[in-house]
C-alpha cells in the first residue's frame, strides 16, 4: 500500500468517526417525570396542580397525569411549586395503598372513580407540554384536584378516619 492510499483511508476513517459523533442523541425528556407542582389553592380547598403523565398516546398520557395528580394528593402531599398546597397527604396511614389495594385498584382503573375528583377547569390553551420517545409520549397538564370531596369520599368508604 502506498502513502496516498494510507492517507485516504485515514481521512475516510476520521471523517466517519467525526460524522457519527454529530448524530443527535435520543431525547430522554420523555423518560423523566417532573415533580407535581402546586399552581394554587381555590377557596373550596381544591388544589390546582401541574402534573406529568406518560402513555402510548396522548389520551393515555393525559389519563395517567390525572391519576398521578390524585395519587400525589392522596399518598404524598404536594411539596413543589407555590406555597399554599397542603403538603400533608389525605391518607396518612403507613402502607395504606397496599392495605387497601383492592379498593385503590378499582378507584384508579381506567375511567374509574378518581375522575370525579379531577377537573380540567384550569387548563389553558397551549398550556400542555409534550415530550416524545420512541415507544411513548409524555404530557404535562394543569388539573384541579377536589381535595375536600376526595377526603369525604375516603371517610365514607372507611379508608380514613
PLM region descriptions:
Residues 22-161:
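Domain-level marker for long, solvent-exposed, non-transmembrane regions
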Residues 11-15:
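Hydrophobic helical h-region of N-terminal Sec-dependent signal peptides
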Amino acid at each position: 500500500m502506498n502513502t496516498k492510499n494510507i492517507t485516504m483511508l485515514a481521512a475516510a476513517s476520521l471523517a466517519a468517526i467525526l460524522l457519527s459523533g454529530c448524530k443527535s442523541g435520543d431525547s430522554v425528556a420523555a423518560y423523566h417525570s417532573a415533580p407535581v407542582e402546586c399552581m394554587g389553592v381555590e377557596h373550596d380547598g381544591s388544589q390546582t396542580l401541574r402534573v406529568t403523565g406518560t402513555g402510548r398516546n396522548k389520551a393515555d398520557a393525559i389519563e395517567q397525569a390525572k391519576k398521578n395528580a390524585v395519587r400525589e394528593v392522596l399518598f404524598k402531599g404536594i411539596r413543589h411549586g407555590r406555597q399554599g398546597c397542603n403538603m400533608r397527604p389525605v391518607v396518612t396511614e403507613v402502607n395504606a395503598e397496599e392495605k387497601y389495594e383492592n379498593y385503590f385498584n378499582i378507584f384508579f382503573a381506567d375511567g374509574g372513580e378518581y375522575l370525579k375528583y379531577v377537573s380540567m377547569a384550569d387548563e389553558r390553551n397551549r398550556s400542555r407540554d409534550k415530550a416524545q420517545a420512541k415507544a411513548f409520549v409524555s404530557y404535562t397538564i394543569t388539573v384541579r384536584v377536589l381535595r375536600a370531596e376526595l377526603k369525604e369520599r375516603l371517610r365514607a368508604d372507611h379508608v380514613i378516619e
